């Protein structure tokens, strides 16, 4: 499985000066990342899974991507975040994903938040926040203060996809 985005070779060469790359392309890249996350969430939706997509980025390069596969795998561990963490760890040869940022279509559940915390990711960026306030409070306690954690960064697309999924289930 190819995890790097095609056409990112120029970025890899430019990453020696990460500050300038982030300064020049930061907002543009975040939009591109959420486009990939949304694509992954759509894959889950089309497979009859809860539409959650996740990517992991290191040095502005997508190193892992996944979507929910609980039904397909018949496993509670088939969450998009856990699958992406496994792929990123395998690629980097290390379970510590320091310097990595995670982009998710929905706030992580407590189980995934704990895994992200253990992986020592630098930042967690979510398209839409969970509507479960109890779960949100638990997740906020799990994620370390040093980890950047932002939600509601791409609300319209992800919330519409989630609403359509659950509307079709009822």
Which residues fall in each region the model found?
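Short hydrophobic alpha-helical segments enriched in small aliphatic residues
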Residues: 5, 19-23
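Zinc-dependent deaminase
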Residues: 26-47, 95, 108-170
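A short, polar/charged loop-to-alpha-helix boundary motif
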Residues: 72-82
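Immediate flanking context of iron-sulfur cluster ligation sites
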Residues: 94-106
């Amino acid at each position: 499985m190819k995890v790097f985005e095609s056409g990112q070779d120029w970025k890899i060469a430019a990453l020696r000066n990460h500050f300038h790359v982030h300064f020049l392309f930061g907002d543009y890249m975040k939009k591109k990342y959420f486009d990939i996350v949304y694509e992954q969430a759509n894959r889950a939706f089309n497979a009859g899974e809860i539409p959650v997509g996740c990517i992991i980025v290191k040095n502005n390069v997508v190193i892992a991507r996944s979507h929910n596969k609980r039904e397909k795998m018949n496993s509670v561990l088939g969450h998009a975040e856990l699958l992406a963490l496994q792929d990123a760890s395998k690629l980097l040869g290390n379970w510590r994903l320091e310097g990595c940022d995670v982009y998710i279509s929905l706030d992580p559940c407590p189980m995934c938040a704990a895994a992200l915390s253990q992986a020592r990711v630098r930042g967690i960026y979510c398209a839409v926040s969970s509507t479960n306030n109890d779960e949100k409070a638990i997740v906020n306690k799990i994620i370390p203060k040093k980890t950047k954690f932002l939600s509601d960064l791409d609300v319209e697309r992800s919330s519409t996809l989630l609403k359509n999924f659950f509307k079709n289930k009822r």
